[in-house]
């Protein structure tokens, strides 16, 4: 089974990712992962931390000569900011645990719940791990999954459709043109007019000492029918995707296809009618289901929208209580972003890629890429024969 674990604190020496279950023979290079990490660091509205970090991955195991070995792959991303925190965050007894103590939990963060759960006195012991800095490790893991999906003909595309009150209109243009517009935008928005308004809204939030959330949309093209299953609740593809995406820091909602919009419509307006001809086989003229029916991919693009709440760390702090004195106080302030929706979109791409890669490996199997690709090819041949009425 494909899985990963991450480790590391926000201001610790490094982030570590261990990916287990990749087949042998997958072409992997550090530069590919680095490009995804650089995308995560971009986007208008990021904080000063991104000016310090220049995320680069170091492959420590599981790859030789540019090809995976089938053994666990260990990835390391150094934290350049560690040199400014080495005394505070040292793992040994030399750590100055009285330095940079945080006792005023921030509303909306894991701060208070974390100290209550684990019995910490210093909120720093919570926020260092709960920080979205951890998502750099997830993007590294997702990059390997993305490489595997590319070999299977699956492409992932993410775009921002909303920041704060500004809603984008997605242009009906060819995929290459859409991809180019996203790349040109400072907020990953293919609507240039909405993109400018989003930047202005971020500037206003910065001036007000506030933050902004938004919505991003993920598309997976080339997903074969048959991923996931309806036979048990925990094997349904839509449930697995939603659960994985909801685990991203600050994400508060996930919808697939029409999502909540479909709840206000009649059944005849929501379902995707089925057609057939000798050339196409089975086909649809709409994709309101977002590529998943009954917990199983149906061969259409998988479409998911993800809602991210505004970042809780505010330059004009909200009310809190000091954990030591139990007196009213302003919440602590830690260096943070104004808006991280574009970065979250890149993280969402990685998370989606990993879950789809996991589903592909479960469906097709194979300890090597040769075996996986052969199984995948034979399955698609059978599907095409069925579509043609064979």
Curated annotation (Swiss-Prot):
EC number(s) stated in the UniProt entry for this protein: 4.2.3.5
The record lists the catalysed reaction(s) as: 5-O-(1-carboxyvinyl)-3-phosphoshikimate = chorismate + phosphate
Binding-site positions, FMN: 129-131, 249-250, 294, 309-313, 335
User: Which top-rank group of organisms is this from?
Assistant: Bacteria
Could you tell me which Pfam families the record lists for this protein?
A: Chorismate_synt
- Which purpose does this protein serve, as stated in its record? This reaction introduces a second double bond into the aromatic ring system.
What Gene Ontology cellular component terms go with this record? cytosol
Q: Does the keyword Flavoprotein apply?
A: yes
Q: Which cofactor does it need?
A: FMNH2
Q: What does the Swiss-Prot or TrEMBL cofactor note state?
A: Reduced FMN (FMNH(2)).
Q: What is any one GO biological process for this UniProt entry?
A: amino acid biosynthetic process
Q: Transmembrane stretches, by residue range?
A: none
What is the recorded name of this protein?
Chorismate synthase
NCBIfam families in the cross-refs: aroC, PRK05382.1
Q: Which family does it belong to?
A: Belongs to the chorismate synthase family.
Q: Which gene encodes it?
A: aroC
Pathway involvement of the protein, from the record: Metabolic intermediate biosynthesis; chorismate biosynthesis; chorismate from D-erythrose 4-phosphate and phosphoenolpyruvate: step 7/7
Q: Which UniProt keywords apply?
A: Amino-acid biosynthesis, Aromatic amino acid biosynthesis, FAD, Flavoprotein, FMN, Lyase, NADP
* Residues bound to NADP(+): 40, 46
Give the top-level enzyme category: lyase
